């Protein structure tokens, strides 16, 4: 008779998904329109266009750029269009919003691009602890994507998972 310890977690057949795998290493930078406003509040078309013409756009090469205005100013839509047209040759992408909003968007895009076929009829645990903070939006989106295909969905670690969803027997 063998008294060797048995790893019941390893034998459970659970599949663990770590939301941190969707964190990117892309460069995300902000472009604040406030820096191009007269007195930090007013957009003067001629001055703005000249600033856009003389700005060094190569600094954004390969980056994902979040175009926003940190001042409480009214920015005409064409100003965002002009910035986008200047960023297009260099930047990987541009987005209207803050850098944090852009990081969230990129994170969600990766979740939505995930091949859910590998989780079909599996018992899945979505890892809850990690080195990187993961927002609730990620857990919501992972649940939305996986629920239609998994046998069961849990949160936490394999040794102490919280049940979230279980497919009803047909």
Where do the language-model regions lie?
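A domain-level signal for the structural core that forms small-molecule/cofactor-binding pockets
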Residues: 52-53, 112, 128, 137-138, ...
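N-terminal, charge-rich interaction modules
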Residues: 1-75, 84, 91, 149-152, ...
